[in-house]
């Protein structure tokens, strides 16, 4: 199977996993990116079986609405049973790097609200140590240079992602050359830098379940 077929397989597996737990009042948290898009497409076939969704980005909200799935603001929702999203990297503890699509802050907020965070990815995303994929950091624009200097002190090589503004109006620094042995600790250190909104490490709140698309089918890993 090619990469898109693997993504379709894990997206369908996620729908199959959550459907038995949904009812007419259920609201599903939905992530951002190519794998999440496959999940939206698969979920849309069952839109009569749940109430609606909370989107982690404007792009996701647009795709959900195009499928006729109601989109709710998170502030109007008391709880989310599930949040389903992809990842740029995952280790075996289901600590993740996310944010390749620049939606990391809203993704992290929705994940924090959800009872169960299901990550869907193809097998290439599972790594022994995080950091080969550059770590995205969302930054208040005026703090870009200050934050970059602090990230260098932490051992990284930050690169400004030109031409990209997040849905929150901020910029992204992609931090290269990090070997992330202690994801929770590094997540906290980067978030403590003045001017940082958040970073793409999902370690303090990792995924609960990883559905991994492989040539031999979908494998399930639990935290």
From Swiss-Prot:
EC number(s) given by UniProt: 5.3.1.6
Active-site residues, Swiss-Prot/TrEMBL: 107 (proton acceptor)
Domain of life according to the entry: Bacteria
Record's keyword terms, sorted: Isomerase
Pathway(s) annotated for this protein in UniProt: Carbohydrate degradation; pentose phosphate pathway; D-ribose 5-phosphate from D-ribulose 5-phosphate (non-oxidative stage): step 1/1
Catalytic reaction list: aldehydo-D-ribose 5-phosphate = D-ribulose 5-phosphate
GO MF annotations in UniProt: ribose-5-phosphate isomerase activity
Gene Ontology, cellular component aspect: cytosol
GO biological process: D-ribose metabolic process; pentose-phosphate shunt, non-oxidative branch
InterPro entries reported in the protein's UniProt record: NagB/RpiA_transferase-like, Ribose5P_isomerase_typA_subgr, Ribose5P_isomerase_type_A
TM segment ranges: none
Keyword set includes Magnesium: no
Residues noted as binding substrate in the record, renumbered to the chain: 32-35, 85-88, 98-101, 125
Similarity comment text for this entry: Belongs to the ribose 5-phosphate isomerase family.
Self-association and partners: Homodimer.
Protein purpose: Catalyzes the reversible conversion of ribose-5-phosphate to ribulose 5-phosphate.
Name recorded for this polypeptide: Ribose-5-phosphate isomerase A
Source organism of the structure: Pseudomonas aeruginosa (strain ATCC 15692 / DSM 22644 / CIP 104116 / JCM 14847 / LMG 12228 / 1C / PRS 101 / PAO1)
């Amino acid at each position: 199977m090619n990469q898109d077929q693997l993504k379709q397989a894990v997206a369908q597996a996620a729908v199959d996993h959550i459907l038995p737990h949904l009812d007419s009042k259920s609201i599903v948290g939905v992530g951002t990116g190519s794998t999440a898009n496959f999940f939206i497409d698969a979920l849309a076939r069952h839109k009569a079986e749940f109430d609606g969704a909370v989107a982690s980005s404007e792009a996701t909200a647009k795709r959900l609405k195009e499928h006729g799935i109601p989109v709710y603001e998170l502030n109007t929702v008391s709880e989310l049973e599930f949040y389903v999203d992809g990842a740029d990297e995952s280790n075996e503890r289901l600590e993740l790097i996310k944010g390749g699509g620049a939606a990391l802050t809203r993704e992290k907020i929705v994940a924090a609200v959800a009872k169960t965070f299901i990550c869907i990815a193809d097998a290439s995303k599972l790594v022994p140590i995080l950091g080969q994929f550059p770590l995205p950091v969302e930054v208040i624009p005026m703090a870009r240079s200050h934050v970059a200097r602090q990230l260098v002190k932490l051992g990284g090589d930050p690169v400004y992602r030109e031409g990209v503004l997040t849905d929150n109006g901020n910029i992204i620094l992609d931090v290269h050359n990090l070997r992330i042995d202690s994801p929770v600790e590094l997540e906290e250190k980067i978030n403590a830098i003045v001017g940082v909104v958040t970073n793409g490490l999902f370690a303090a709140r990792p995924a609960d379940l990883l559905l991994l698309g492989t040539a031999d089918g979908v494998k399930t890993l639990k935290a």
